[in-house]
Amino acid sequence: MNKDHEEQLEINEVSQKNKYKSIIESLLFMSGEPINIKDLATILNCKQDKVSSLLNEMKNSYVGKDRGIKILIHNRAVQLVTKPENSIYVEKLLKTNVRQSLSQAALETLSIIAYKQPITRVAIDEIRGVKSDRAIYTLLEKNIIKECGRLDVPGKPILYGTTEEFLKFFGLDSIEAIPNLEDLLKEFSKEEN
């Protein structure tokens, strides 16, 4: 084999390696969850050892202080995660996005639950004047409210209350830290006048 041919093979190998790394990075980014190394090997149609080797190279390339992400490998699964030192900024973004993702109905429902908890869906519907099923479902899915028992009346309706996630979401130490409703109403009426 001549020297030019060997150099071309080496270039092709580096190019293929970089392509695999690019694909792995895309898969990890889009997944958001750990991906089994075996599954990556299947997707890439290559051996698990090769994927592990590529992952280790990628992991080392993310080590620099100027990088905001890193590769986490645990129990033969791999995930792209943010570096712990950036967590405060990531949390700010997530709080902003969650607030933006709550509909007006969900925010109204959440306010009622926060101030009147524990409260039933029927009581929420009466206060709002419309059904709140979808808003309650959304808040349950986001773990901002929870079922916290049943009312001891016929039919035993579910009681809803806020979660620890609710407190974190609004930066509160406890449920008692919620602004006083009467004070808010007085302030609101002053602003309207």
Curated annotation (Swiss-Prot):
It is found in: Cytoplasm. It comes from the Bacteria. Gene3D superfamilies: Winged helix-like DNA-binding domain superfamily/Winged helix DNA-binding domain (1.10.10.10). GO terms for cellular component: cytoplasm. GO terms for biological process: cell division; chromosome separation; DNA replication. Pfam families: SMC_ScpB. Keywords: Cell cycle, Cell division, Chromosome partition, Cytoplasm. Homodimer. Homodimerization may be required to stabilize the binding of ScpA to the Smc head domains. Component of a cohesin-like complex composed of ScpA, ScpB and the Smc homodimer, in which ScpA and ScpB bind to the head domain of Smc. The presence of the three proteins is required for the association of the complex with DNA. Participates in chromosomal partition during cell division. May act via the formation of a condensin-like complex containing Smc and ScpA that pull DNA away from mid-cell into both cell halves. Belongs to the ScpB family. This is Segregation and condensation protein B. The gene is scpB.
